[in-house]
Regions:
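Conserved RNA-binding domains used in RNP assembly and mRNA/RNA metabolism
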Residues: 2-99
Length: 99
């Protein structure tokens, strides 16, 4: 998997937490990520919540490469929820129009 700036990905941290974020820049020992959100399993299923409660949501955050054990492309439905949570814009999903 090739990671690029502006990709929305899911990181599995060494602590077991999952963070969804948009990659800003990739360095050899760290990534700069925008608006990290944690994926948490709750009574209603998967929920998204801020990863840093006391930080400004719109700031860029440093994530050391030693802090995560896996990274993957975020599922489309979760990606759309992330975009809506961070921008307030609900992405349009592809639909087949029938007559």
């Amino acid at each position: 998997m090739n990671l690029n700036a502006n990709d929305i990905v899911t990181f599995k941290l060494t602590t077991g937490e999952e963070i969804i974020a948009r990659i800003k820049t990739i360095e050899s020992d760290h990534y700069l990520i925008d608006q990290p959100i944690s994926a948490v399993l709750g009574p209603q299923g998967l929920q998204l919540m801020p990863s840093l409660f006391s930080a400004k949501m719109e700031q860029t955050v440093r994530l050391n490469t030693g802090s995560w054990i896996m990274v993957a492309e975020t599922r489309e439905d979760i990606r759309n929820s992330y975009i809506q949570a961070t921008t307030g814009i609900a992405p349009v999903t592809k639909q087949i129009i029938t007559g």
